[in-house]
From Swiss-Prot:
One of its GO terms (molecular function) is magnesium ion binding. Keywords: ATP-binding, Kinase, Magnesium, Metal-binding, Nucleotide-binding, Thiamine biosynthesis, Transferase. It is an enzyme of class 2 (transferase). This is Hydroxyethylthiazole kinase. It comes from Akkermansia muciniphila (strain ATCC BAA-835 / DSM 22959 / JCM 33894 / BCRC 81048 / CCUG 64013 / CIP 107961 / Muc).
């Protein structure tokens, strides 16, 4: 287990690598969050590509993509087939990909699709407590895409899911937990206002893809995602304590986020 100092150094290293290399993140994501997702990737220093067509996704992956995001938020059968194709090509090219199983357990099509995708070697799985519990095979109660369980409730399921899939699992909530099934890192950055803006959680999936493109391990990428997004959320609320302006300030905060901010603000919970 890394010390807090080592974790902070790793997070700042990932931030620096994103800004230095500007990885291309191919996002097969939901229609509700595409603008925020694309702008968030640009703000942190990555390059977004938003596609839904299978043929074009394969072309993009072959052109130098750093990571792939698969987000099931508004999935259709056609898009689901494109996701399967993109995932197979990403695996063939050894490109890391992230699964964001939005509202899995609440709706049948995406639950079936997520069950298939989790067996195809995602590097990171990001979800709220209910989504992670459902994907791991546990019963959970949701309100659409929103979780009614705490992230701590899902920690056991997250560890099992990580061991089963080989992915790092990031459970987001008041406390964010990142695990590879053996190690667990808990981070306590963020603000409740983040849950009042549509797309912030889904955009964390995109950020985790950017981190996966540069980080030495999926677990470290998950930790970096939680810390960077959480700190940006805190900074955004200090500037804009209402939902509409908060969304804009979140992008500004990610753009302005410095290594010094990470050193000063990162909070890790002892387990």
């Amino acid at each position: 287990m890394l010390s807090s100092t080592d974790l902070v150094q790793a997070v700042t290293a990932d931030l620096g690598k994103i800004r230095e290399t500007a990885p291309l993140v191919l996002s097969l994501t939901n229609s509700v969050v595409q603008p925020l997702t694309a702008n968030l990737l640009l703000a942190i220093g990555a390059v977004p590509a938003m596609l839904n067509d299978a043929e074009e996704a394969v072309d993009m992956l072959r052109s130098g993509t750093g990571a792939l995001l698969v987000n099931l938020g508004t999935v259709t059968r056609e898009q689901g087939a494109a996701m399967q194709t993109a995932v197979r090509e990403a695996n063939r090219l050894n490109i890391p990909w992230v699964l964001d199983p939005v509202a899995v357990g609440a709706l049948s099509l995406r639950t079936r699709l997520a069950g298939q995708l989790k067996e195809q070697s995602p590097r990171i799985i990001r979800g709220n407590a209910s989504e992670i519990m459902a994907l791991a095979g546990y019963s959970s109660v949701t309100k659409g895409p929103e979780s009614t369980s705490s992230s701590a409730d899902a920690l056991h399921a997250a560890r099992e899911l990580a061991l089963h899939t080989g992915a790092a699992v990031l459970v987001t909530g008041r406390t964010d937990y990142s695990t590879d099934g053996r190690q667990v890192t808990a981070t306590e950055n963020g603000h409740a206002m983040m849950s009042r803006v549509t797309g912030v959680g889904c955009s964390m999936g995109a950020l985790s893809a950017a981190c996966a493109a540069v980080s030495p391990t999926p677990l470290q990428a998950a930790v970096s995602t939680a810390v960077l997004m959480g700190i940006a959320g805190e900074m955004a609320f200090e500037q804009s304590p209402s939902p509409g302006s908060f969304a804009v300030s979140l992008l500004d905060s990610l753009y302005a986020l410095s290594p010094e901010d990470v050193v000063r603000r990162a909070r890790f919970l002892s387990l």
